[in-house]
């Protein structure tokens, strides 16, 4: 069962059990054993969410899955809730064909139907469909652009010879003690790099304010919510 949880294929499970146990398990037998996971997974995904989670982090991870005798790319949506004490909990996950407004909306509405409420800040990357669904499903909440994704977006547009220095200065900017200090450092970075990394500075300028939403919170929350 542990091999299944770790993502080992049924074919490889068969090989491992033969080598370790000296006994052969067919792929169908392994598949039947795997079905034992269906009930606890279903229970986990459908459980109620009575606790208050003012902050949620959402993201999609792309995985390969076999469907209709073909290997396809699938998007695994994940939501992590953070309560007032800083405790993190996986609120839900679901597999979709792709990231679109309607798939993210469906995912969020499922969380809300299970009791998710009072969300103050949603942290995510800047995928257009995701951001639009956040606005629709969590109206009145603030959006924090994931600082790790944002940094990569900036560095991807920066000439390689400047990327290390820029990445270091961006870290200092995000580690600033106050919003005012972060804004001062942002302007300094912009002035320093606009001539040599103009596209990167455009990304920084356009997305900066959304990336410092959490700066309005007490410092004890910021590290957990930045990405």
Residue locations for each model-derived region?
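Short, amphipathic alpha-helical "recognition" segments used to contact nucleic acids or chromatin
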Residues: 1-7
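Short, solvent-exposed positions on alpha-helices
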Residues: 11, 28, 120-121, 149, ...
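DNA-recognition alpha helix
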Residues: 11-22
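Short helix/loop capping segments that flank catalytic or ligand/cofactor-binding pockets
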Residues: 14, 65-66, 131-132, 156, ...
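RNase H-like nuclease fold core
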Residues: 23-27, 32-123, 128, 132, ...
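Alpha-helix N-cap recognition
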Residues: 100, 146, 178-181
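Conserved beta-strand -> loop -> alpha-helix junction used to position metal-binding or nucleic-acid-contacting
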Residues: 121-128, 133-169
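Acidic/histidine-rich catalytic cores and adjacent linkers
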Residues: 175-227
């Amino acid at each position: 069962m542990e091999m299944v949880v770790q993502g080992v294929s049924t074919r490889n499970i068969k090989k491992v059990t033969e080598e370790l146990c000296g006994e052969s398990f067919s792929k169908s037998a392994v598949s039947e054993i795997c079905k034992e996971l269906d009930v606890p997974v279903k229970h986990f995904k459908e459980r109620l969410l009575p606790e208050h989670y003012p902050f949620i982090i959402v993201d999609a991870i792309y995985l390969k899955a076999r469907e209709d005798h073909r290997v396809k790319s699938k998007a695994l949506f994940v939501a992590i809730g953070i309560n007032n004490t800083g405790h993190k909990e996986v609120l839900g996950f679901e597999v979709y064909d792709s990231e679109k407004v309607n798939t993210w909306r469906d995912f969020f509405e499922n969380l809300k139907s299970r009791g998710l409420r009072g969300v103050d800040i949603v942290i995510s990357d800047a995928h257009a469909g995701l951001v639009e669904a956040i606005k629709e499903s969590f109206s009145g909440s603030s959006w924090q652009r994931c600082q790790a994704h944002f940094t990569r977006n900036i560095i991807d547009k920066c000439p390689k010879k400047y990327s290390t220095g820029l990445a270091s200065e961006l870290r200092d900017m995000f580690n600033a003690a106050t919003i005012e200090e972060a804004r001062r450092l942002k302007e300094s970075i912009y002035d320093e790099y606009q001539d040599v990394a103009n596209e990167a500075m455009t990304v920084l300028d356009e997305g900066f304010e959304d990336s410092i939403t959490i700066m309005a919170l007490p410092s004890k929350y910021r590290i957990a919510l930045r990405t």
